[in-house]
Amino acid sequence: MRISLGYPAWDAEEAMLRQRNVSTPLATCVDETNLRGMQRHIEKMHVNDSVIRYILKLVNASREPGAYPNPLSPRASRALLQGAKAWAFMFDRDYVTPDDVQAVFEAITAHRLNGTSQSSLDGASLSKRLFDSVDPLAA
């Protein structure tokens, strides 16, 4: 998965540089036990066959001869499923919808379709083209 957080504002980056050797301890937001529990919950999450078919249609559309420079691999399929499950979990659901797949689609596929982590712009447009070519209701 690739996401961009952007760059800090001038003042924030300047403050960061001025604090050279000052380390700020991070507060724990989740302990290991809770994290493992969340992971187990996500693994057990229900995924309807129509969502699986939707992911397969998206991935297979990328594999049409000449359609995309770097078709999506089975690893991308798994990443889409895991990403969609995690997205659903963040919204306190124990099931996955096509909307969850759509929410994580570009972040998971753009760099894969483009074949490089350097320029995600082309990858993002490739992701959008692929995403727009598959109807989630037809899955």
Question: What role is predicted for each listed range?
Answer:
Residues 1-57:
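Conserved AAA+ ATPase core "coupling" helix
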Residues 23, 28, 38-40, 63-65, ...:
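Preference for short coil/turn "hinge" residues that link or interrupt alpha-helices
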